[in-house]
Regions:
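A solvent-exposed, charged loop/short amphipathic helix patch at secondary-structure junctions
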Residues: 68-91, 169-173
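A short beta-strand-to-alpha-helix junction
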Residues: 87-98, 142-150, 163-189, 199-204
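Short glycine/proline- and charge-enriched loop/turn segments
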Residues: 13-21, 136-141, 168-173
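Active-site-proximal alpha/beta segments of enzymes that process anionic O-linked groups
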Residues: 1-78, 183-184, 189-213
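Histidine-centered active-site microenvironments of extracellular/periplasmic hydrolases
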Residues: 116-117, 123-167
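Conserved small/polar residues in nucleotide/adenosyl-binding loops
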Residues: 220-225
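Metal-dependent active-site segment of extracytoplasmic phospho-/sulfohydrolases and closely related
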Residues: 96-139, 188, 192
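Short beta-strand segments
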Residues: 50-57, 94, 119-124
Length: 225
């Protein structure tokens, strides 16, 4: 009983499933463990590498997503799924975001140390409701999604050598940084162009590093803000 992510992952030259590979069923892996795997791949010195990381990120239970010493926003407990604990839940969730910031910073530092043409593209597949309004929605699987579930980050980083090799990508993404975009529409076209992949499936009008990028109307179906 595997997910599509599992099937796609197993098509890679190298793949690791941290939790599934553990003999301990109660094992709760940290996203930090992915960095060791990245270091291992980078050490191979391959000229071309495409690395995909699927993090736990900010999934509930939030307090399991960051080390206790990284609990910056307090109190972060108890975090039962009840409106009365909303402040604690938000603190714990914000701690996961802060931890993800640290994770991405360390990943970028690892890439910088390679002194090669490198680019990183990061996004989330969903946001989160934490009892934000009178509907008292929680998590992210509502039949009718809210703004909080749809609003996600979309982050691009390029190394200095990448910017020098492909200045048009850096200049274009800088011009496009304040434009509206849909991550589900733009992620893969942007990734393909960053990697210089030529395919009939590539749509540069949806790539934010392309001069051809075109903002398209954002449609919400039965969405109440």
């Amino acid at each position: 009983n595997h997910s599509f992510i599992d099937f796609f992952g197993k098509e890679a030259d190298t793949f690791d499933f941290i939790k599934e590979d553990s003999l301990d069923s109660a094992y709760n892996p940290s996203d930090d463990e992915l960095l060791a795997l990245v270091a291992k791949e980078l050490s191979k010195g391959n000229q071309k590498q495409f690395i995909v990381l699927h993090t736990y990120g900010s999934h509930f239970n939030y307090r399991e997503r960051y080390p206790s010493e990284d609990a910056f926003f307090l109190p972060d407990y108890p975090v039962e799924a009840e409106v009365k604990y909303r402040d604690n839940l938000v603190n714990a969730y914000d701690n996961t975001i802060r931890y993800t910031d640290s994770f991405l910073s360390r990943l970028i530092h690892m890439l910088e140390e390679q002194h090669v043409d490198a680019a990183m593209l990061y996004t989330s597949d969903h946001g989160e409701d934490i009892f934000d309004d009178s509907r008292h929605l929680f998590l992210h699987a509502s039949p009718v999604p809210s703004y909080y579930q749809l609003h996600v980050p979309f982050l691009i980083w390029m190394s200095d050598t990448y910017r020098e090799a492909y200045p048009e990508h850096w200049q274009t993404v800088t011009k496009n940084k304040d434009k509206d975009l849909s991550s589900s529409r733009s992620f893969f076209p942007t990734m393909l162009e960053l990697g210089g992949v030529q395919t009939s499936y590539r749509n540069d009008s949806s790539s934010v590093v392309s001069p051809l990028y075109t903002m398209k109307p954002v449609s919400y179906t039965h969405l109440t803000l």
